[in-house]
Amino acid sequence: MLRRGSLRNPLAICLLWWLGVVAAATEETREPTYFTCGCVIQNHVLKGAVKLYGQFPSPKTLRASAWLHDGENHERHRQPILVEGTATATEALYILLPTELSSPEGNRPRNYSATLTLASRDCYERFVCPVYDSGTPMGVLMNLTYLWYLGDYGAILKIYFGLFCGACVITRSLLLICGYYPPRE
């Protein structure tokens, strides 16, 4: 117990300061600290995942909804996305289920984004993720992120193997086109 005059003791001050830091660090903020996402369009189908890190008040009461926005006017052209989610007190993973794209004019805009909205009685958060085409370098990276969240490590290895083999074939072809022929032994 603290005695009168014990607050002059540096050890007691240090202990009280440390308890204050721990109490402040474990205080429930009721909002995510940060999030990561991986959303990709492959064969005219959107798939993605959003992972949130932080402290959530009660994961069971969070309601999630997601929308795909296409083009410049985000409110005019939007399409609902089905969401599956699992959450704990410190992190949440929301999978955007495969959704076929429907473009209003028949052509595909270049800039898609997915919006995940989480709501409960006393908090409301919106997370916007860019969506990339699978044929672009960022699309490959987002696809790898999505597969990592799903835990599909076999598919990740297939992509890396395909990239490695493709790079080897392209490099050899460029060397042959430039006139370099490897010496024979």
Curated annotation (Swiss-Prot):
Disulfide bond entries: C39-C129
Lumenal topological domain residue ranges: 25-149
4Fe-4S keyword on record: no
Transmembrane segments annotated in the record for this chain: 150-170
Keywords linked to the UniProt accession: Disulfide bond, Glycoprotein, Host endoplasmic reticulum, Host membrane, Host-virus interaction, Immunoglobulin domain, Membrane, Signal, Transmembrane, Transmembrane helix, Viral immunoevasion
Subcellular location(s) per record: Host endoplasmic reticulum membrane
Membrane topology according to the record: Single-pass type I membrane protein
Domain Ig-like H-type, residue spans: 30-133
Functional note: Plays a role in the modulation of host immune response by down-regulating the surface presentation of HLA-G molecules. Selectively targets HLA-G molecules for degradation by a mechanism distinct from the one used by US11.
Name of protein: Membrane glycoprotein US10
Name of the encoding gene: US10
